[in-house]
Structure formats: C-alpha cells, structure tokens
Curated annotation (Swiss-Prot):
GO annotation, cellular component aspect: cytosolic small ribosomal subunit
Gene of this entry: rps5
Source organism of the structure: Methanosarcina mazei (strain ATCC BAA-159 / DSM 3647 / Goe1 / Go1 / JCM 11833 / OCM 88) (Methanosarcina frisia)
Molecular functions per Gene Ontology: rRNA binding; structural constituent of ribosome
Annotated protein name in UniProt: Small ribosomal subunit protein uS5
HAMAP family in alphabetical order: Ribosomal_uS5_A
Source taxonomy: Archaea, Methanobacteriati, Methanobacteriota, Stenosarchaea group, Methanomicrobia
General function of this protein: With S4 and S12 plays an important role in translational accuracy.
Domain named S5 DRBM: residues: 48-111
Record-linked NCBIfam families: PRK04044.1, uS5_euk_arch
Domain of life of the native organism: Archaea
Family: Belongs to the universal ribosomal protein uS5 family.
GO terms of biological process kind: translation
Cross-referenced Pfam families: Ribosomal_S5 (PF00333), Ribosomal_S5_C (PF03719)
Listed InterPro entries: Ribosomal_Su5_D2-typ_SF, Ribosomal_uS5, Ribosomal_uS5_arc, Ribosomal_uS5_C, Ribosomal_uS5_euk/arc, Ribosomal_uS5_N, Ribosomal_uS5_N_CS, Ribsml_uS5_D2-typ_fold_subgr
Database matches in PANTHER family: 40S RIBOSOMAL PROTEIN S2, RIBOSOMAL S SUBUNIT
Length: 209
C-alpha cells in the first residue's frame, strides 16, 4: 500500500513511528498505545494487501425521505499473521471502500499460528495451533488444525480472510446463514482472534505479541 508522504501524525504512537523509535508492528503492539491513524499501519506494514469482501446497498427512512448508502466490507492482511476487518458506509462506492480499508487497518491484530494437527509434526506456522470457534449473528465458524499441504477447506469468504491472515491449511465447520457475507467474515475473524485468548506453554516466561 502506498504511504502518504504528507502525513503529519497527531497521536503519540504516530509521532514515535515517524521519529523511528517504533520501527515494527510488533513494537507498536507491545507499546500498549492505541493505533488511531491508518498511516501508522502503512509505514509499519508496507506489504499489506486489501480485498473487498462485500458491497451492499442500505437504506434508512428519515423525515426528509429515504436515504441510500453503500456499505463496504474489506479485509486487509500481510499473509504473515497480521489481519484486520473493517466496514464503512458512504453515499458512493469508492469513498465507502476507502473508509472500510482505513477501518480495517485500525482493527488490525496479530494472529498466532502453529502446527496443531495431530497428522502433522512439521513445526511450521501453517495452521491454527488448536481448534477455535467464532460467532457473529447466526453464523458460527470453527477452525480445526489441518496437516501441511491440505489447503484451506472453507467457503469463499472465509478463505479470503484466512489467506490474508497467513493461514495455509485448515479444516472448517460452519453453522447458520453463511450466505450473509458480513456475518460469515466477522465469524471467521472472531475465530482467528480466539487463538490469542489461550496462552500456550511455549510462551511461558516469554513476551507475547
């Protein structure tokens, strides 16, 4: 993603990034400072990719009549552990997508990966370390560790989210109305975040991201 050369940081973390005191995304997360400017992500993760998952027309009735807007849902990630999901609305499609990309950058998080399948003992971070479940609305998504080389056994929306997070092999189980792209993406993203809830023995006595 292109970095805005004219950016003037307004937050403490943004100033630290520009000054070079925070040089990586790991350091930014460990600092404990909130990420409130998308340009911070542009500087620290220059290889970040974005993809539009869904564009939908939404309507709202007001005193002056019916108001129509477009809602965009976007996933961003560097295919190496960092992933973010965002959505935004605007009267035009282009601005809605740009706002959703910025929202996804501000929601970016690090997903721990591992080799959690009993069928595989390669030790490489290619799948989830253990079974996790995420929910959004009526949709429930369960991610199950898979052996290396299997690929991503999931629906189209979930596959896009998992690929951006750097997950290469995984089994999935889904329940609910998965035709809802927004809830399907949110449930998958929530499942990825559940990986960070449990502290693994390998991290005992060490700093976690």
């Amino acid at each position: 993603m292109a970095f805005d050369q004219d950016w003037v940081p307004k937050t403490r973390l943004g100033k630290l990034v520009v000054e070079g005191q925070v040089a990586s995304m790991d350091e930014a997360i460990k600092s404990g400072l909130p990420i409130r400017e998308p340009q911070i992500i542009d500087m620290l993760l220059p290889d970040l990719e974005d993809e539009v998952l869904d564009i939908n027309m939404v309507q709202r009735m007001t005193d002056s009549g019916r108001r129509v807007k477009f809602r965009a849902t976007v996933i961003v990630g560097n295919r190496n552990g960092y992933v973010g999901l965002g959505q935004a609305k605007d009267v035009q499609v282009g601005p809605a997508i740009r706002k959703a990309i910025d929202a996804a950058k501000l929601n970016i998080t690090y997903i721990r990966r591992g080799c959690g399948s009993w069928e595989c003992a390669c030790g490489l971070p290619h799948t989830v370390p253990y079974e996790v479940t995420g929910k959004a609305g009526s949709v429930s998504v369960t991610l199950i560790p898979a052996p290396r080389g299997l690929g991503i056994a999931a629906g189209n929306t979930a596959t896009k989210v998992l690929e951006k997070a750097g997950i290469k092999d995984v089994w999935t189980k889904t329940f609910g109305t998965t035709r809802s792209t927004l809830n399907f993406a949110k449930a998958t993203y929530d499942a990825l975040n559940q990986v960070n809830v449990v502290r693994l023995p390998v991290y005992y006595g060490k700093e976690e991201i």
